[in-house]
Amino acid sequence: MTTQPLLIAIAPGIALALIIYLTDWHEREPLRLLLKLFAIGFIAVIPTAIIEQGLLMLNPFTGILSIAFIAFLIAGFTEELVKRHLVIRYALNRVEFDERLDGIIYSVFIALGFATAENINYVVFAFASNPYVGIYRGLISVPAHMLFAITMGYYISLSKFSIDTGLKRAYLRKALVMPFLFHGIFDFILMAQMDIVLLAFIPFTIYLWVTNLKKLNSYYRDSKNNHRQH
């Protein structure tokens, strides 16, 4: 194994994690905690892949229905369920989680750890002979994991800081449902290989970026205002 494919595989996740880390400049989270969350997401790829392989063997469909099953249930639902579980298990109740922006930061670091491990598998091993896979995944797939995580973290924070028990539960459900739907639609568009479906890719990708940057900016402003008051 040469070093170059490995560097290509890990660079996007690390670069995006650094950008998100620098976004939180009013009260940065402990680097040790963020590295731990990144590592947890990285390791979680192994059990997730085992679950996905099991579900793949249970796929009863063929053709376009099979693609939808893989995109939404096997990839979208399974991966986002695992990532949400990790955020709840390892970040939700930490004392450092003291403002809304933190929910996005924690979710993104777990997701980028996950995406980096997944990227190593694709770029270094599964498609090592194709030099374009690393570029494609670095520009499309890894950033997509970050965007799904911004949505997840947005609702995780709404849940944490809500005083209403019903709303807490509703936002936790949304922290799974919305990323799962985004992930499923994203993968389905790419996997379907149908011209009419592929036409939706650019508009949907723009929508993902715009809506999630709005979420990130709203919590950034919230963080900024909180620290002005102190």
Report each predicted region and the residues it spans:
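Hydrophobic alpha-helical segments at protein termini of multi-pass membrane proteins
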Residues: 1-230
